[in-house]
């Protein structure tokens, strides 16, 4: 900015103040702020922005100065669809019925109070707008998840008008396929509703009472059984009498060496087979963590898994083998996978807590239960239906000694309201209805997950599971068609949607290989094309970590191979002929 323009800006500001009697900043301070605005901005923010739940790769980095964040005008236009008009020294930025008009770099009629940023920056010929000015257009600027990740979030006025549990869902990629074989007892029209009540003393551990309170017969309930204990026939009969079928969480808590092809294993399997109802067998779950007696031994784990699978296949064909992990850590999950032919369903346990590991400094209230599902869902749902083996939300924690009823209502509502629509490959979900303050071992009496003790939480659960999409009985004759979905692991850049290469490979069944430079070769039906890869690090759902999305331009790929697709309500629908 030239000295002549600086003087003109100061004089203009002074005249505005005189004419309108607005609270002013002294001329000396105006000069000081103009000088500061010509100094370099600090960087260090993520090169991604989340807008209404979708990831965008920035064309230019976000900067910070005087506690204000600046976003380039080209990025603001690409992300939010604001409109601009320029005439002489005047720039107008508008969104819906709001607009900012700049004259010589300053907003017309700006009050110039100490809390306002009335000007923009010009760096390397680009205009940068401060967050306060963007918010004048009705947007809300903050951090996505938590400021520790340095990822800026922008919410449109329309997004802000929604309830918290409905915000920042983002877009979904759907893939529709025909002639898809179903797994054992797999429903195609909804999700089997399940629960765990054996430690809910408030309802005397009664499945019938739980069904009555929630207004819905649950299709399944589960029970923990230690390896070496007999098959729980009496309890299984109680589940059947309550209108459901059992899930057995079978845990080799003395280690994997005790798992052998012996009389105990065979009898357990025979007892399960004699029940003549579907049984979901969650054998040796959460092995990806460090807290089980069978963690850290992936080769032995797979060997024993295959043994159990083969025995069940022979003695109890009604058993569905559920391979079930915990949400974190992700890095160890795949090394325990036994192989497609040995697994019927893939599951994950998900918990929303206010603090991690009873640490007041490890606040985690921002975590989204749906995004906690994304890694397992995106990694495995193209080949196996998905189960949420346990889901729980804290409503009270000893960490801060506070009740968090609103937190529980929000997370439960978000999970059960949107799960059927956004994650059609999820086929079971079990709520963990336990007050751990009473029923957990010492050292784990931290959170209360029970929904039956407080009316507001119970009502939130009941209201969202009452739909026909949550099933109360086993579905027969499943449809041949199936809808797949893919969430979060994609971003927008330069007006193009970039999906992780694994989506192209696994969900579209295309061959993907590295090519020259920063390109990948995609082959489909004998035809090959080279496409440019763009990478972006996005926030993981927990623990302030990042994941790298190696994105491929999806529109370019679909057009090149003439794959049928369309956009509906912001979501991409792809039709795959099979």
Model-found features: residue ranges?
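Aromatic- and acid-rich polysaccharide-binding/catalytic face
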Residues: 334-364, 387-393, 432-434
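Glycoside hydrolase catalytic-domain groove-lining segments
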Residues: 234-249, 355-397, 452-459
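Primary recognition of N-terminal secretory signal peptides and signal-anchoring hydrophobic helices
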Residues: 2-173, 473-578
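Active-site groove signature of glycoside hydrolases
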Residues: 268-298, 319-328
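N-terminal carbohydrate-binding/catalytic regions of secreted carbohydrate-active enzymes
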Residues: 193-271, 411, 418, 423, ...
